Design a protein with these regions (language model features):
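Conserved pre-ATP/AMP-binding loop-to-beta segment of ANL
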Residues: 53-55, 171, 181-202, 208-209, ...
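ANL superfamily adenylate-forming
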Residues: 63-64, 149-194
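Conserved AMP-binding A3 loop
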Residues: 67-72, 191, 198-222
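AMP-binding/adenylate-forming catalytic core of the ANL superfamily
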Residues: 127, 134, 144-147, 290, ...
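Conserved AMP-binding/adenylation subdomain of ANL enzymes
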Residues: 221-238, 245-289, 303
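Gly/Ser/Thr-rich phosphate-binding loop
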Residues: 260, 287-292, 301-360, 372, ...
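Conserved ATP/PPi-binding loop(s) of AMP-dependent carboxylate-activating enzymes
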Residues: 381-412, 448-450, 544
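AMP-binding/adenylate-forming catalytic domain of the ANL superfamily
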Residues: 477, 510-532, 551-570
Length: 571
């Protein structure tokens, strides 16, 4: 018999599935399920998985090797893993650093930790030893689970931790393979309370000390019902989410959301993202739902999409705004619309374009079921343009518990009437939100407010541009002027002629106050989740302007007299 909590969880899920294309009714009727106790892995996953021979997990690598597990195999393996962890002394509330690539053991251990009541702290395999030491110390992590390729980085910094290696035996580490000898049945240490901790994320942002975001057994497992409504997944789907472990989006779309409806999680492991191979894999494996960050979509449209007869039904994107031109190119080739969604590590999906609704290219969408979202100005008043802010009364299930170890920051974020995302947007007459930028990305030039995203959207439509980031460059007369940092498409040379052509095209397209006055062809520094580190670009720009120097492939509008009546000094 299902638990009362599971019954309520499934009733809320089923309402969203029943109205998956009826936005107004879903918004009107959905309520977050009320429950005091709930363990998503025990109360939902195990009953769904028992005797279920459908693929729950399907991993393919670029060499063609495949491995898969049925839902029932995952249920049993995670039970063994939970018993194994308990045997090693892991208890409810203990924090586990899990530093694994996309391999089967990752999912077994994520389920096991939830069943046990331990707290998962997913980490990318790219972290340095200094990063790991910071996480272990500030996060009070007691258990380290790592890939063999990562073990050396824990030397001298994890001596007090339980250390488990997945993949091969390592001196001083317990081999995860030993879990195979433990019992197939698992009995929990009592009930799991909804407010018990479940996941601890270190934000990928651009500061040297990432914030620690704490989620509960309710906020992510239950909160992702809003994400389910946005993604539009259904039982039997094969869902491919282009994401790496350690990023919150991995938990969104490679754990909770697909398995909440019994969809297959599909993984394509490759050393470097290859658009042609990825597209071929989509076709060969019959993927029905694809969610990818903008960087991946921008790479995919460089291929001739019409050559790939995909069987996709749902296309989604999150992480950063997607330029309308990308959406148009995909629509022209496949007849499918990429539907954008918006959320944060601190939340589940709060805004989005769900299936069956009119999509306005480039829009973040509208509030998703369970969320009320408003735009607030600097005085905290409702505005047509302002900070994207979640109404906290009633509090959505998907909002984080706190910033762990930082009571003051938590109070500022969650102690008032709204949770502010630090993202700025505008809203149109039909309730669609439009991204403007991070609160620290938007700048003024000659007293005009500049949204980098608007300029980047124009740049990405130029035939020579693959990717772009617009930042402010210090200017004596205007305070700041827009500068474009550009990655060119393959085969395009980073010459003065290319710079002239792009600047001229932007001059013809943009308003005079938006004019891009500097362009540099360069790499774009990114976080492990693929977000551009604009703070690094800004810091370098400030140094150069103060020193009166320029980059090797940096061009100013003053270099091209035909583009301006008053050339600007080039250094």
């Amino acid at each position: 018999m299902p638990t009362e909590a599971a019954t309520r969880f499934h009733a809320a899920r089923d309402l969203l599935l029943a109205h998956r294309t009826d936005y107004d009714r879903a918004m009107a009727e959905f309520r977050w399920p009320e429950m005091a106790e709930f363990n998503w892995a025990l109360d939902h996953f195990d009953p769904m998985a028992q005797g279920n021979a459908q693929k729950g997990l399907w991993i393919v690598d670029e060499g063609g090797h495949e491995v898969s597990r049925t839902f029932d195999e995952l249920r049993l393996a995670s039970n063994r893993a939970a018993n194994f962890l308990r045997h090693l002394g892991v208890r409810r509330g203990d924090r586990l650093l899990v530093m694994l690539p996309n391999r089967v053991e990752l999912w077994e251990l994520m389920l096991a930790a939830i069943k046990l009541g331990a707290v998962l702290s997913p980490a990318t395999t790219l972290l340095s030893q200094a990063d790991l030491q910071d996480r272990i110390e500030r996060g009070n992590l007691r258990v380290v689970i790592a890939d063999p390729s990562c073990c050396a980085r824990f030397g001298g910094i994890a001596d007090g931790c339980v250390r488990i290696v997945c993949g091969s035996a390592e001196p001083g580490w317990t081999d995860y393979a030993d879990s195979a000898g433990h019992a197939d049945a698992f009995a929990p240490d009592g009930p799991t309370r909804c407010d018990d901790p479940c996941m601890l994320y270190f934000t990928s942002g651009t500061t040297s000390k990432p914030k620690m975001v704490l989620h509960s057994q309710r906020s992510y497992p239950v909160g992702h019902l809003s994400t389910l409504y946005w993604l539009g997944l259904q039982e039997g789907d094969v869902h491919f989410n282009v994401s790496s472990p350690g990023w919150a989006k991995h938990a969104w779309s490679c754990l909770f959301t697909p398995w909440t409806v019994g969809a297959t999680i599909f993984i394509y492991n490759q050393g470097r993202f290859d658009s042609a191979k990825t597209l071929g894999t989509l076709v060969r494996c019959g993927v029905s739902s694809l969610c990818a960050p903008p960087t991946a979509w921008r790479s995919l449209i460089l291929e001739d999409l019409t050559r790939y007869p995909v069987r996709l039904r749902e296309l989604t994107s999150a992480g950063e705004p997607l330029n309308p031109e990308v959406i148009e190119r995909v629509m022209a080739a496949w007849g499918l619309t990429i539907r954008e969604g918006f959320g944060q590590t601190e939340s589940t999906a709060m805004l989005g374009n769900p299936p069956g609704q009119p999509v306005r290219y480039g829009s973040m969408g509208r509030p998703l079921p369970g969320y009320r979202v408003e735009l607030l100005d600097v005085d905290g008043k409702s505005a047509r343009e302002g900070e994207v802010s979640v109404v906290l009364s009633p509090r959505p299930a998907g909002v984080m518990v706190a910033y762990a170890g930082d009571e003051e920051r938590s109070r500022r974020a969650l102690g008032g009437s709204h949770y502010g995302t630090a993202d700025v947007a505008s809203i149109d007459d039909d309730g669609y939100f439009w991204y403007v930028g991070r609160t620290d990305d938007v700048f003024k030039s000659s007293d005009y407010r500049i949204s980098p995203f608007e300029l980047e959207s124009a740049l990405i439509e130029h035939e020579a541009v693959a990717e772009a980031a617009v930042i402010e460059s210090p200017d004596a007369r205007r305070m700041f002027v827009p500068k474009a940092c550009v990655i060119l498409k393959p085969g395009v040379q980073p010459t003065a002629d290319t710079a002239r052509a792009i600047l001229a095209a932007m001059r013809a397209r943009l308003a005079p106050y938006q004019k891009i006055r500097i362009i540099e062809f360069c790499d774009l520094p990114k976080t492990v989740s693929g977000k551009i580190r604009r703070t690094e670009l800004r810091a370098l720009e400030a140094q150069r302007r103060a020193a009166g120097t320029r980059g090797e492939l940096e061009f100013f509008e003053g270099d091209f007299p035909e583009l301006t009546d008053k050339p600007r000094a080039g250094g």
